[in-house]
Regions:
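A conserved beta-strand element that flanks and buttresses the S-adenosyl-L-methionine
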Residues: 231
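Short catalytic micro-motifs in class I SAM-dependent methyltransferases
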Residues: 234-238
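Class I (Rossmann-like) S-adenosyl-L-methionine-dependent methyltransferase catalytic domain
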Residues: 1-221, 242-246, 260-335
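Structured loop/turn residues at beta-strand edges in well-structured enzyme cores
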Residues: 160, 225, 253-254
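Conserved acidic residues
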Residues: 163, 228, 257
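A short glycine-rich, Lys/Arg-flanked "PGG" loop and its adjoining helix->strand segment in the class I
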Residues: 245-257
Length: 335
C-alpha cells in the first residue's frame, strides 16, 4: 500500500478508535439516523429487495417511505414541548379530512398518506399515544418498528437467494441490525467490514453468527467480482480526494453487479469542496465528478437527490438533510 494510503488509514482508524464502544454502538442509529426511518437506509434495503424480487414489492416500498416521512415529522414535533391533546387533535383533523389542527398546519404528505390507509392504521397509533410532557420525547419502539414487523412477515416464506453482499464501513452493524430484524439478512450472504476494531467487536457481539471483519476499503481482501452487490453509507466524504478514488476503485473491483452508495454531503457543482477536519475530512463532493469515477470502472451511476425525490413523489419539503444523495450503480454489460 502506498505511503499516503497508509497514513490516511492510520488517521481514520485513530479517529474512530478514540470513541468508546458504547458510543459507537449507538452512533447513527438514533433519531433521524435510525435506519427504520432514515430514508437512505430504507432506499438501501429497497435496492437489495429489488435485486432479489424485482418490482414485486413496489407498493410496499412506497408505503414504507411514506411511513418514514410521517414518523420523521412526528419526531420534529416531539422536539418541542407537546401535549397528548395536540397529537389527538392532529388525528381528529386527519379523520375529518382536514389539514389544520387548531393552528398546526399538517403537511400535505401526512394528509395524503393517511388517506391511502384504511382506519385503524399505524398513523392512528402514532397520534394516539401519550408522550411524556417534556421536549424530545421518544416515539415508542413498537411504533418505530411498524414496517420491521410487516417486512419480516412478508419475507418469512421466501427462500434464501444467497446473493453475496459486501458492506464496507459497516460500523457497529448499524444497518445490518435492520437487515436482520426485517427478515432480509437470511436471504443474503452478507459480509461487513470496518477499519475500527471496536466497531467490529460490537458487531460480532450483537451478531456472533454473521460475518464481520476488520478491513480496509482501500485494500479489500477479496478477489475481483467476489460479491454480487455492495452497499455503503457515509464513507466517501471522510476521505481525501485521492483516497476517495482508490476506495471507489476497490469497491468497483470486488462488486460484480450493483452498488448502492449513500452520501451525506454532496452538491451539484463541478468540483469537490475539500474540508479537512482534524485527522480526516468532511468534504462536499461533486455529484458529477463522483459519478465520473464510478464510470471509469464500467459502471453506470444513477444519482438520486433525496430531497428532490421526496418533493417530487410525496410533496415533502422538510427533509433534514438537503445535501443527501444516493447513487444506484450497475455494472454495464459488454456490447
Amino acid at each position: 500500500m502506498q505511503e499516503q494510503l497508509k497514513l490516511e488509514t492510520e488517521c481514520l482508524a485513530r479517529s474512530w478508535m478514540r470513541h468508546s464502544r458504547n458510543t459507537l454502538r449507538t452512533y447513527l442509529v438514533q433519531d433521524v439516523q435510525d435506519p427504520r426511518i432514515n430514508v437512505q437506509s430504507i432506499l438501501t434495503r429497497h435496492f437489495l429487495i429489488e435485486q432479489l424480487f424485482g418490482v414485486r414489492f413496489e407498493t410496499l416500498t412506497e408505503h414504507e417511505l411514506r411511513f418514514a416521512l410521517v414518523t420523521n415529522w412526528l419526531l420534529r414535533l416531539l422536539k418541542k414541548p407537546v401535549r397528548p391533546r395536540q397529537l389527538h387533535l392532529i388525528l381528529d383533523a386527519l379523520l375529518a379530512g382536514g389539514d389544520d389542527a387548531e393552528g398546526l398546519k399538517i403537511p400535505s404528505y401526512v394528509s395524503e398518506t393517511f388517506a391511502t390507509l384504511a382506519a385503524p392504521n399505524y398513523m392512528c397509533d402514532l397520534f394516539c399515544w401519550s408522550p411524556v410532557e417534556t421536549s424530545d420525547a421518544p416515539v415508542p419502539e413498537h411504533l418505530l418498528s411498524t414496517f420491521e414487523v410487516i417486512w419480516r412477515e412478508v419475507l418469512a416464506c421466501e427462500e434464501p437467494r444467497r446473493a453475496s453482499v459486501l458492506e464496507p464501513a459497516c460500523g457497529s452493524a448499524n444497518d445490518y441490525r435492520f437487515l436482520e430484524a426485517f427478515g432480509l439478512a437470511r436471504l443474503l450472504d452478507y459480509a461487513g467490514s470496518d477499519l475500527c476494531e471496536k466497531n467490529i467487536a460490537n458487531a460480532r457481539g450483537i451478531f456472533p453468527d454473521a460475518r464481520f471483519n476488520v478491513g480496509n476499503v482501500l485494500e479489500i481482501d477479496a478477489a475481483d467480482g467476489a460479491y454480487d452487490y455492495c452497499f455503503v453509507h457515509d464513507l466517501f466524504e471522510h476521505l481525501s480526494v485521492e483516497v476517495l478514488e482508490v476506495a471507489i476503485g476497490e469497491i468497483c473491483r470486488v462488486t460484480q453487479k450493483g452498488i448502492c452508495a449513500g452520501f451525506f454531503n454532496m452538491h451539484d457543482g463541478d468540483a469537490h469542496v475539500v474540508r479537512p477536519v482534524g485527522a480526516y475530512h468532511w468534504n462536499s463532493l461533486s455529484v458529477a465528478k463522483t459519478k465520473a469515477i464510478f464510470e471509469q470502472y464500467n459502471m453506470a451511476a444513477s444519482a438520486v437527490h433525496v430531497d428532490t425525490l421526496l418533493r417530487s413523489r410525496f410533496g415533502c419539503t422538510d427533509t433534514h438533510n438537503k445535501r443527501a444523495w444516493t447513487f444506484v450503480i450497475t455494472r454495464q454489460q459488454p456490447t
